[in-house]
A protein has these predicted regions:
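Short, charged/polar, Gly/Pro-enriched secondary-structure boundary elements
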Residues: 46-50, 90-93
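Hydrophobic residues on conserved beta-strands that form the core of alpha/beta folds
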Residues: 3-6, 57
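Vicinal oxygen chelate
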Residues: 15-16, 55-101
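Residues embedded in well-ordered beta-strands within globular domains across many folds
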Residues: 7-10, 61
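Short, Lys/Arg-enriched, disordered terminal segments
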Residues: 1-4, 100-101
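Core segments of cupin and vicinal oxygen chelate
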Residues: 1, 10-48
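Loop/turn position at the start of each blade in beta-propeller repeats
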Residues: 4, 36, 78-80
Length: 101
């Protein structure tokens, strides 16, 4: 394991467009990506991913440069490798390898 930093926090949203407007108005964040199923909001030191229910579990993500070497890794549509793990209380942690992305 080679953790470097927290990358993002993912929370569910039943209406991505409505949530993006709310976060922009209340936190003045930047929209890095948005479509009908998810959005990525940029803050100074972290990102928030808004996802539709059932798409991904609510979680926080940490960068782990060794994820690409794991046999159980999956690949997001943007090419980033990831694995989900759960702590003893079933909280979900995503480990991602941003590589050169």
């Amino acid at each position: 394991m080679n953790l470097t930093n927290v990358d993002h926090i993912a929370i569910e949203s039943s209406d991505i467009a409505k949530s993006v407007i709310w976060y922009k108005n209340n936190f003045r964040c930047k929209v890095k990506h948005q479509d009908s199923t998810w959005a990525l909001l940029g803050f100074e030191n972290i990102k928030i991913a808004l996802v539709t229910p059932g798409q991904h579990p609510p979680h926080f993500a940490v960068v782990d440069k060794l994820v690409a070497n794991k046999e159980n890794k999956k690949t997001h549509r943007d090419g980033i490798h990831y694995v989900y793990e759960e702590d003893p209380d079933s909280n979900v942690i995503e480990k991602i390898d941003r590589g050169t992305s």
